[in-house]
Amino acid sequence: SSTCIRTDQPCPYNESCCSGSCTYKANENGNQVKRCD
């Protein structure tokens, strides 16, 4: 089984995250990147 992705790490979809939530957030460059909540 794969380990879950932690908060603020890039994620492909909600199910990948330990929190079960992956949303778009702005990075330092102002780009929208999906990261775990």
From Swiss-Prot:
The organism sits in which domain of life?
Answer: Eukaryota
One biological process term in Gene Ontology? defense response
CC annotations in GO: extracellular region
- Tissue distribution of the protein: Expressed by the venom gland.
Question: Where is this chain's protein located in or outside the cell?
Answer: Secreted
Q: Which UniProt keywords apply?
A: Calcium channel impairing toxin, Disulfide bond, Ion channel impairing toxin, Knottin, Neurotoxin, Secreted, Toxin, Voltage-gated calcium channel impairing toxin
Q: Which residues does this entry assign to the site Critical for insecticidal activity?
A: 10, 27, 35
Job of this protein: Inhibits insect, but not mammalian, voltage-gated calcium channels (Cav).
Comment, domains: The presence of a 'disulfide through disulfide knot' structurally defines this protein as a knottin.
Q: Which named protein is this?
A: Omega-hexatoxin-Hi1c
Recorded source organism is: Hadronyche infensa (Fraser island funnel-web spider)
